[in-house]
């Protein structure tokens, strides 16, 4: 039975998206020649050179390490808000920005200082297995570098003696390595001495990963994307706030199982979680190092609020607004010659 009307013109052709597979495009139409001129038409063999060849050798050597991985999901709200406070201060003063990786990396350094038994490497001494306890932390930083042709390579330079640096010094050393990696001016010494590495595939949207552990290191930490849980991505911001849904991130700790056990790896991730949640004065130390004249936000548990029966919350918000209007100058940074944190109890959000 026909369901079309003969007196109507034929329907226009449906719009079909161009094929994305190079094979499909080469078999069906001109898209292969018009969209991707550099798409190969036959198999090609390229010899790995320089950094790519070194990476391949290190990856093959890493297969000799028996590894295991611990993972932990942590809330990112406090990290996001305190980073915004720091960057707002920097924008008003000396310029620059602090990244999530800066804060996470320094929290990891502090955690390893508190758990020195994890700052170790496996070695052979006199033909027998041994563990070397390192006096200082060699902090490896995985950097994705693109050349002029758009080819990407991985470089892992090292911040030497990271445990001896303040947060501000750590940020400067971090930025120096990144800048020299981008300009191909790193030296051989910059790649030696790592005891732990931090890799952040979360910048690409990766939720979690299990990175390879290189020979000579005890563990490698992976950081996932900072985002809302996938099941809530379609929810409006207002609804997310009403539900108390915040952004989270996954951490992974891949370690040499010959010298580090799973319980210790789990405690390390718990300690990093505690620091990024502000439970041991971590943000106070960071703010002091960066000369931020403000009190960092603190982690507080949420509570239910019924606007139909509880009238106290709007009144307290009004009082806080009035306090800032009338006494906000008491917390202002008005001394250009010295760093001083000014506080007033009426201006505290927790009040």
Segments (PLM) and residue ranges:
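Extended, highly charged clamp/arch subdomains and adjacent linkers
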Residues: 305-351
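C-terminal catalytic/motor cores of large multi-domain enzyme assemblies
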Residues: 1-314, 327, 334
């Amino acid at each position: 039975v026909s369901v079309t009307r003969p007196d109507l013109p034929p329907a226009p052709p449906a719009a079909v998206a161009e094929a994305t597979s190079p094979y499909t495009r080469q078999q069906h139409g001109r898209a292969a020649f018009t969209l991707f001129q550099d798409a190969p038409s036959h198999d090609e063999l390229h010899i790995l050179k320089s950094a790519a060849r070194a990476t391949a050798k290190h990856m093959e050597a890493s297969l000799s390490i028996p590894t295991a991985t611990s993972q932990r999901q942590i809330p990112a709200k406090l990290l996001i808000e305190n980073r915004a406070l720091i960057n707002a201060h920097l924008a008003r003063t000396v310029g620059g920005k602090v990244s999530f990786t800066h804060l996470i990396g320094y929290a990891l350094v502090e955690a390893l200082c508190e758990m020195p038994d994890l700052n170790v490497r496996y070695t052979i001494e006199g033909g027998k297995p041994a563990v070397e306890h390192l006096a200082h932390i060699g902090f490896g930083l995985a950097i994705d570098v693109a050349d002029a042709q758009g080819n990407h390579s991985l470089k892992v330079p090292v911040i030497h003696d990271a445990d001896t640096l303040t947060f501000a010094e750590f940020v400067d050393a971090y930025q120096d390595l990144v800048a020299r990696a981008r300009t191909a001016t790193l030296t051989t010494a910059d790649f030696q001495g790592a005891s732990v590495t931090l890799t952040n595939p979360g910048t690409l949207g990766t939720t979690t990963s299990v990175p390879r552990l290189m020979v000579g290191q005890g563990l490698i930490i992976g950081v996932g994307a900072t985002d809302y849980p996938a099941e809530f991505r379609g929810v409006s911001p207002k609804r997310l706030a009403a539900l108390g849904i915040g952004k989270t991130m996954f951490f992974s700790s891949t370690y040499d199982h010959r010298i580090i056990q799973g319980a210790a790896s789990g405690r390390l991730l718990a300690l990093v979680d505690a620091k990024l949640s502000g439970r041991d004065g971590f943000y106070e130390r960071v703010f002091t190092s960066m000369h931020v004249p403000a009190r960092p936000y603190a982690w507080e548990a949420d509570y239910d609020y019924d606007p139909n029966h509880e009238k106290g919350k709007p009144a307290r918000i009004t009082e806080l607004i009035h306090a800032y209007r009338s006494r906000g100058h008491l917390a202002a940074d008005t001394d250009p010659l010295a760093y001083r944190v000014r506080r007033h109890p009426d201006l505290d959000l927790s009040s």
